[in-house]
Regions:
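N-terminal transmembrane-helix/juxtamembrane module of multi-pass inner/ER membrane proteins
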Residues: 1-39, 73-101
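Membrane-helix interface segments
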Residues: 23-24, 53-57, 123-128
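Short helix-capping/hinge motifs at transmembrane helix termini and TM-loop junctions
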Residues: 36, 51-52, 80-81, 145-148
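Alpha-helical membrane-inserting segments
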Residues: 47, 67, 71, 75-76, ...
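Interfacial segments of alpha-helical transmembrane regions
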Residues: 47-70
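Small-polar-interrupted transmembrane alpha-helices in polytopic inner-membrane proteins
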Residues: 63-77, 128-141
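Membrane-embedded catalytic cores of phosphoryl/pyrophosphoryl-handling enzymes
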Residues: 91-181
Length: 181
């Protein structure tokens, strides 16, 4: 794990050196706030539930993201106890308050990729907005020096798997949406 952390830190230092700027700081802080506790995705799911046509997708989205938040923060992170980059290398000034808990895997990324997967599988055009937003939220965690690239990669793989499983359950267990009159 030491070699992975060393490699991860090199990437994070390059991001800090080559990309950081006051304007981009604001964008990344905003993106990270959107992803906190899956709030943007749960909100989108809630709005979708108002429509008969998208209710099933909205329910699946809100339920899967809520599950992700719980399972990741209570179970998965406690299995790995990986220190955050901001704790390992304190020479980089944090632009946000230090997040609670362990680093691995990224909860922001997990919820965002799960949501983007569910939305894209339900309707490809939903992915046109969801995938770039998920990518921005995920990248913001590295930019802000609170997650390693390997945290993001693992959460991405897990999110695709969980999103696909949630979609499969949705299509098998929930009634098909009815067209609105």
């Amino acid at each position: 794990m030491k070699n992975i952390t060393k490699f991860d830190l090199k990437i994070l230092k390059k991001i800090q050196k080559n990309l950081c700027s006051p304007a981009l700081d604001k964008v990344m802080i905003g993106a990270t706030k959107l992803g906190t506790a899956g709030a943007v995705w749960i909100g989108i799911g809630g709005l979708m539930m108002l429509s008969k046509k998208y209710r099933r997708c909205g329910f699946t989205l809100a339920a899967a993201v809520s599950f992700d938040v719980f399972a990741n923060n209570i179970l998965v992170k406690n299995l790995f106890h990986r220190a955050r980059p901001c704790d390992v290398d304190q020479t980089v000034a944090l632009k946000i308050r230090r997040p609670f808990g362990a680093s691995f895997p990224s909860g922001h990324t997990l919820t965002s990729v799960t949501a983007a997967t569910i939305l894209t599988l339900n309707k490809k055009s939903f992915g046109l907005g969801a995938i770039p937003l998920a990518a921005l939220i995920s990248f913001s965690r590295m930019y802000l020096f609170v997650h390693y690239p390997s945290d993001i990669a693992a959460a991405t793989a897990l999110g695709i798997g969980l999103g696909s499983a949630a979609y499969a359950l949705e299509t098998k267990a929930l009634p098909a949406p009815k067209e609105e009159a």
